């Protein structure tokens, strides 16, 4: 992967599809691509391969690193509602923005404009806020609590296996929490 200051380092870009209800990792991918814009299609493919077992996904929630018109189109073609942040959001928007609906969407809006409008609605903001309590804790706990900060192996195939094992370990840890309490 290219790094700042010139040169290249052997780096990997790990992705995880996380179920919003259970916080279980349901799909993983790993690449050597430096940014996330090209990672929506591979994770959608992984999710669609699991659809028969897990049920079809309905919404894709992602941060600004995934935002592109192509990703919005890919989501809509896969019958998913995309909620991909277009830009950083203000932490303290004015009260009139927080509690009022935006003006109606124009009839000839592009898919990107429709998604941007959806993100400004009260329901869209509430749904997007779920990302902060779904996928962010997964990566935070994997890094901080489980102590996984770098891969031990080299080579895309081996590192993909290592990433799958890390996600499996997270799922086992999470299933212990989700398990009904006995006694």
Segment roles from a protein language model:
Residues 1-183:
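Anion-binding and metal-coordination hotspots
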